[in-house]
Amino acid sequence: GINITVIGFTNPNIKGWLSPLLWEGMTFESLVPMAQDVVDRVKAEEKSDVVIVAIHAGTGDGDGSSIESQGLDLFKSLRGVDFVVCAHDHRPVVHKTDSICLINAGSHCRNLGFGTVTLKVEDGEIVSKTLDADLLPVDKKNVDIRMQELFHSDFEAVKAFTLKEVGELKTDLRTRDAYCGMSDYVNLIHTLSLGCTPAQISFAAPLTFNGFIEAGTLVYNDLFTIYPFENQLFVVKMTGKEIKDCLEYSYDRWINTISSADEHLLKITDAPDPRTGQKRWSFVNRSYNFDSAGGLVYDVDVTKPSGKRVIIRSLADGSPFDESAEYNVAMTSYRASGGGDILREGACIDTDRIADRVVEYYPEI
């Protein structure tokens, strides 16, 4: 028979997102050239006829610049592999040559990745192999009635849970307000974070790009708009200068220096969204890395150049802020582990050794 081998790899940048508490005893390395070594070994052991490499990584640009998105790097470099299946960056795309195909179906079940291999076998030996790949759009209207019936009770149970009342909201929350200054949405996250002893300052970013929750009864499903990601909360010791440098780095990711009202304050571009293909204005960088600070009184002068925009007046209680002093800063495990590069690039903090700075952490809030 035909031997089909599937080899899976997780993302080599996991240590840049998650607390070491979640991957203790594991190490991570680039998929290039490691994946080729694994492919060669497994093919020799399994006598594989067709090889599929499935990776939790994005497509990337194929220039070796992103350890988090090495799909195209593997597509260009792997030998003896028929299909590379990737995702993570939510960008639907297919790349093909005569000897290998890359499939990224995107996100939210908008498409299905579809690969075809045609083999010609003579006297038990494969004499030719033809590959093809495509994306099949998922038609929401074309429902499998039998599956719908089989899963109806499960669907209704989940729906009932997500509509369970969990509280009251006194004011409307618009996540988009966070891009232009103080907002009730991010202030809510800051307030929760600062409620965790011994936090004095909070870093937080808008985790939903353009969400809205109306004042009134809050249901469980609304929590996914407020905070869609699973994170732990870390309280990290930082100097005042490191805090300021992180804020400078963060604001430089999402605002421009302007001199008149005719200029764009936000770093946006009028280009098709690579994840959906929709033509719209969007941020140049990811909005979930647009950190602001709670527990501080500060201004952001948008007429000043990068590195000179943030003026910290005091702590929230009016006491002086000192760049040479140390403060306890609440942030997500994603940020503390290096996510968004804010700590590492902004303040030259070695996030591989973040445990040396953690004074408290909360697995659940």
Residue map of PLM features:
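Active-site-proximal beta-strand elements of phosphoester/diester hydrolases
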Residues: I2-G16, I52-A54, C101-A105, T130-A133, ...
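General beta-strand structural signal in soluble alpha/beta enzymes
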Residues: I52-I55, F83-A87, I103-N104, I201-A205, ...
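Conserved beta-sheet core of the metallophosphoesterase superfamily
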Residues: S66-V121
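Catalytic centers of hydrolytic enzymes
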Residues: W17-S30, D37, A105-I365
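Catalytic metal-binding/acid-base residues of hydrolase active sites
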Residues: T10-P12, H56-G60, V85-P92, G106-H108, ...
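Domain-core and long-helix interface of multi-subunit machines
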Residues: L31-R79, V94
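Binuclear metal-dependent hydrolase catalytic cores centered on His/Asp/Glu-rich metal-binding motifs
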Residues: G1-V50, G124
